[in-house]
């Protein structure tokens, strides 16, 4: 993880679209990062894709220029995440992979580890990646166009 925030900051700061993929226990973290952090706070178009549905159509949008955050969970759905990631590695280039195992979640007992994916991923995405991207874009993540600014 050390240094990855700088890579993301430098490579993603000018991207108009960033996909976020997660599945199973990481789907919530992927969704929050996509709609709350990237869309709401950074004004970046960001579809959230479920890794279990990726090879049913969304994979047709992939090319070497599409940035994609990929969350690889620990637990029963990990093989589904790994399958999508294998495809992405073959045909994509702008991949930013957060693997729960590399973040140390496998130190927890396997009977409960998958329940902590969201907590681990959200901490990194919301507190590290969002902030670094915000600094690089010179776009404070507290800024809003409409939320709390106009009646809606």
Where are these predicted regions, by residue range?
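Short, small-residue-biased leader/transition segments that mark boundaries at the very start
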Residues: 1-8
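A SIS-like phosphosugar-recognition module
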Residues: 8-152
